[in-house]
Regions:
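Beta-strand secondary-structure signal
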Residues: 44, 135-137, 211-213
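Non-heme Fe(II)/2-oxoglutarate
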Residues: 5-105, 113-125
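Catalytic core of non-heme Fe(II) oxygenases with the double-stranded beta-helix
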Residues: 113-191, 208
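Ligand-binding loop in jelly-roll beta-barrel domains
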Residues: 200-211
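Double-stranded beta-helix
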Residues: 215-221
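Histidine-centered metal-chelating micro-motifs
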Residues: 123-124, 195-199
């Protein structure tokens, strides 16, 4: 009987959640998958392993094995790699992102800060927004989930604990989706408006969920 109630509840809640399928693509380097399930544009790029590895080589020395933590990235890590550095690649993605919106051409992009978030089982990032014009999240490590199939039968609203990132806007409105969720994958780099509400749900499992985030400001021509 409980199982029937849970299944019915999950089906009824599903109608408020958009699918995580890309609505379009930009074929630059790296390619961008584009998501606009409820108005604001979400772009997702897949960066190469060596790009992730450069950041992880620094982060591995800073994370705690027994507790969640956050720390800023220093300039030498941010600019390591020249034109293939974290800073240059992030600026490039932001410029391409802006061209795909209705914003004028960016005259100047200023990335204010990069930071790393390290989290373990049971830890969430409550829904929040950022202070910049454009923000992003890059996944550096993902955990091994327990009872993954069971968790994926649920939604964010019904208490899923699979570590997904969730983007939300508005509330319950007719003819409109309210949220979209993405499963973290190493190398996935999401770009989105800094004001867009988002959060990471907790997960059950072994290992670390590690991500990089940034805030950037844009001056238009």
């Amino acid at each position: 009987m409980d199982g029937m109630r849970t299944g019915t509840k999950t089906r009824s809640l599903k109608k408020y959640e958009a699918t995580s399928e890309a609505g379009g693509h930009d074929r630059g380097d790296p390619p961008l998958a584009l998501f606009s399930p409820f108005g604001p544009l979400i772009a997702q790029a897949e960066v190469p392993p060596d790009f992730v590895g450069r950041i992880n080589s620094y982060a591995d020395k800073r994370v705690r094995a027994d507790a969640s933590s956050e720390f800023l990235l220093p300039e030498d890590v941010v600019f390591d790699g020249g034109e293939r550095s974290l800073m240059r690649q992030t600026e490039n993605l932001i410029r391409r992102y802006l061209r795909l919106t209705d914003e004028p051409t960016a005259a100047k992009i200023r990335v204010d800060v990069f930071w790393v978030v390290s989290q373990y089982a049971g830890t969430s990032s409550p829904v929040h927004f950022h202070s910049g014009d454009v923000s992003g999240v890059l996944y550096l490590k993902v955990p091994q989930l327990d009872r993954e199939n069971e968790e994926l039968q649920k939604t964010y609203i019904s208490g899923r604990q699979a570590g997904y990132i969730n983007f939300l806007i508005g509330g319950k409105q007719r003819f409109s989706k309210s949220l979209v969720s993405f499963k973290p994958r190493v190398g996935d780099f999401y770009i989105f408006p800094g004001w867009l509400l988002h959060g990471a749900e907790p997960f059950r499992g072994v290992g670390e969920r590690r991500s990089l985030a940034f805030n950037a400001y844009v001056d238009v021509a």
